[in-house]
Amino acid sequence: MRASLFIVIFVVSFITISCLSTDDEEARWIEKRGDCLPHLKLCKADKDCCSKKCKRRGTNPEKRCR
């Protein structure tokens, strides 16, 4: 009885900790994504875009996120 109680407490605490760490990763990813430029916005380098693709297309000399 006592051993099963410890096992249940351990499992519940493990699940809680893993869920909290996942939320922190998502928050960091969303925060990081807020620093990037969306599709078709003017850019200078690949790192400026959310898609990591800053390209010049067509006769227009401006580079945009693709």
UniProtKB/Swiss-Prot annotation:
Disulfide bridges in this chain: C36-C50, C43-C54, C49-C65
Propiece residue ranges: 22-33
Keyword annotations of the record: Calcium channel impairing toxin, Cleavage on pair of basic residues, Disulfide bond, Ion channel impairing toxin, Knottin, Neurotoxin, Ryanodine-sensitive calcium-release channel impairing toxin, Secreted, Signal, Toxin
Gene Ontology terms: cellular component: extracellular region
Leader peptide range in chain numbering: 1-21
Cellular localization per UniProt: Secreted
SUPFAM superfamilies: omega toxin-like
Cell inner membrane in keyword set: no
Domain writeup: The presence of a 'disulfide through disulfide knot' structurally defines this protein as a knottin.
Function: This toxin stabilizes ryanodine receptor 1 (RyR1) opening in a long-lasting subconductance state (20% and 38% of the full conductance state have been found). It promotes an increase in the opening probability at intermediate concentration. Furthermore, it triggers calcium release from sarcoplasmic vesicles (68 nM are enough to induce a sharp release, and 45% of the total calcium is released after toxin (100 nM) addition) probably by acting as a cell-penetrating peptide (CPP). In addition, it has been shown to dose-dependently stimulate ryanodine binding to RyR1 (EC(50)=6.9-71 nM).
Protein name: Hemicalcin
